[in-house]
Amino acid sequence: MVSLCVGVCRRAALSSKVPKFGIFLNSHSATVAEQFAHAGYDWLLVDCQHGPMDSITLSGMLCAISSGGAKSMVRVSGYDDRSGIQQALDLGADGILVPYINTAEEAEAAVSCCLYPTAGTRSVYFPQRSMNKAGLLGYAGVQNDNVIIALQVETADCIKNMDSIAQVKGIDMLFLGQVRRH
């Protein structure tokens, strides 16, 4: 039986001041994802922003990560990628990394896509793999507290608006994307 406090435990782990180690997966291979998940990483991030990723491949990779006990994150295309956010969460991702956030309004839009009403605008579809963790009521009833929402800091506008972005309710972490910062 899966505990319904998984999100609380995840959030407590995030704020525990103990470093969490993970990697970006660009191989698009469930076998590689499974090997890394069993290697002791705390989290693995599947990159759907770059490269050819379809839902079948993503589904297999998320299952593989789950089998090894690591937390799964999926990087989507942006705050306006509602279908990518929805699909990743429906397939069982533990969290979402949203790139190209420049304003608090964009951050709010990203958070809204990740959360069920009344906190957000995520739609419900069942049966889905993510609900296997606790059943429909157990899942939908606590998922707003469970999902990890990370925003990628990578633009000058984001840095300029960092204070207001960081105040958006529902954000668990800001991730520094050093390559594109300008």
Residue ranges: model-predicted function:
Residues 1-182:
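Expand to "…catalyze enediolate/carbanion chemistry for C-C bond making/breaking, isomerization
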